[in-house]
């Protein structure tokens, strides 16, 4: 009778900023969809707004935080370099920013976590608990800049 199933824990499922809480599979089929298989593009729920509007004939490439993912239905492309999420649980606000390779979680209390989403997709090894490689430090700097820009 557990809500969380391995490899997730009660702290890394819905209601959290870990992949178990914010990653939702999306299945798309229909007229004009000729791609098959799986795609790991960074899509957020707001992207549905512009995508549906475009499919209904409304023109535009970006409305507020919504980006159309229609190009993904027919070709292997990228629509988003970063994916942003935030959580307010009433006691400690927290924010997450990720790109295809890394994810940074920042809590209002100052705690930070960083994960390699390629080699550690279940976020078991917080990279900030040890010295970062040059590549990891560079990625952290980029994620921090993007998070700061989004939150302004």
Predicted regions and their residues:
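Long, internal low-complexity/basic segments
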Residues: 48, 117, 127-152
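The feature captures the short pre-catalytic strand/loop hairpin that immediately precedes
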Residues: 27-35
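Short Pro/Gly-enriched coil loops immediately N-terminal to beta-strands
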Residues: 17-23
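C-terminal cap/loop subdomain of S1 sulfatases and analogous C-terminal strand-loop tails that border
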Residues: 1-7, 11-13, 34-35, 46-49, ...
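Short, solvent-exposed loop/helix junctions and linker helices
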Residues: 39-46, 63, 133, 137
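Structural micro-motif
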Residues: 23-27, 49
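Intrinsically disordered, low-complexity polar regions and short flexible loop motifs
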Residues: 120
């Amino acid at each position: 009778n557990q809500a969380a199933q391995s490899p997730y824990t009660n702290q890394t499922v819905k209601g959290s900023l870990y992949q178990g809480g914010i990653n939702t599979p999306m299945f798309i089929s229909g007229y004009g969809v000729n791609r098959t298989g799986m795609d790991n593009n960074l899509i957020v729920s707001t992207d549905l707004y512009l995508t549906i509007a475009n499919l209904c004939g409304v023109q535009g490439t970006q409305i507020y935080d919504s980006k159309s993912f229609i190009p993904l239905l027919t070709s292997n492309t990228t629509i988003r370099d970063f994916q942003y999420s935030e959580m307010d649980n009433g006691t400690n606000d927290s924010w997450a920013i990720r790109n295809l390779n890394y994810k940074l979680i920042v809590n209002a209390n100052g705690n930070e976590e960083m994960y390699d989403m390629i080699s550690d997709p279940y976020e078991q090894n917080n990279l900030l608990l040890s010295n970062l490689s040059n590549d990891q430090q560079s990625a952290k700097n980029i994620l921090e800049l993007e998070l700061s820009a989004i939150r302004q």
